[in-house]
Amino acid sequence: MSRESKPTTSEAHGRLWGARARDWAEFQEGTVRPVFEAVLERTRVGPGTRYLDAGCGSGMAAAMAAARGAEVSGVDAAEPMLSVARERVPTGDFRRGDLEELPFPDEAFDVVTGFNSFQYAANPVAALREAGRVAKRGGSIVVMTFGAPEGMEVVSLLTALRPLLPAPPPGAPGPFALSDEGVLRRFAEDAGLEPQEIFDVDSPWIYADESAALRGLTSTGTRSGRWSTSARPP
C-alpha cells in the first residue's frame, strides 16, 4: 500500500498562489510596480543585463526588465503564474522551481531580485545562499519584503478578507516573516552575502473599483494565521 508524499512548502505555496494567477496578473501585481521600477533603476538593468527574478510570479518585473533590453529568466513554484509570465515575455527563460534549489548554474546572472518571495521560503538563509550562488561576483541581489505591519493599511484589508483566503501550509512562514528590523540583514550575512543598503519604496494599493480590489486581494496566495513578524531560524 503506497502513501502520497507530503508536498513541500514550495509545492504547497505553488498550488495556492497559482489558483488565481490571472487575477493576480490583472489586478494585484501592478500594485508592486513602483518597487519594480525603483529596483530596476538602482541596479541599472539594461541591454545585455542577465536578469533573474526569483519568485517571479506572473512576470511583470521580468517584462519590465526585458523592455529595458535585459536577458530575463524567472523561477516560481506556481506553474499557472509561469504560464502568464511566458505570454508576457516569450523570449524569457521561465522555470518551475524552489528558491532553495534554483535551477540555474553558478554565476549565471548580473542581477537577481526577489519581490515578496524570500519571506515564504521554508529556509530563507538557504534561499539567499542560492541567490548568491547564481549571481556573478560583483553582481546585485535585491530582496523586497514588506515593512513592519503596524500601521499598514493592507493589514486591515487582508485581515477582513481572511475568511475568503485559503489557509497556509502548516508551519509555513507568512508575509511579514522578514519584516522585523535586522532579520533580513542577519539572514543575508548568514548566507554569505554582504548587505549594502536598505531603502524604502512607497507602493500604494490602488484599484479601479471594488470588484477589482476584491479579485486582486483574494489572489494573494494564503491568509496568515496571525500577523507575526517572526522568522524561523535556519
PLM regions and their residue ranges:
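Class I SAM-dependent methyltransferase SAM/SAH-binding core
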Residues: 50-102
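Helix-to-beta-strand junctions that scaffold the AdoMet/dcAdoMet cofactor pocket
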Residues: 121-122, 135-137
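A short acidic, Gly/Pro-enriched loop at the edge of an enzyme's catalytic core
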Residues: 100-111
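Conserved catalytic/acceptor-binding region of the Class I
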Residues: 125, 132, 140-208, 222-225, ...
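Conserved class I S-adenosyl-L-methionine
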Residues: 2-49, 60-64, 81-84, 88
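Short glycine-centered segments of the SAM/dcSAM-binding site in methyltransferase folds
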Residues: 50, 139-140
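A short SAM/SAH-binding and catalytic strip from SAM-dependent methyltransferases
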Residues: 111-124, 147
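C-terminal helical/coil "lid" or tail adjacent to the Rossmann-like core of SAM-dependent
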Residues: 3-6, 10, 17, 195-234
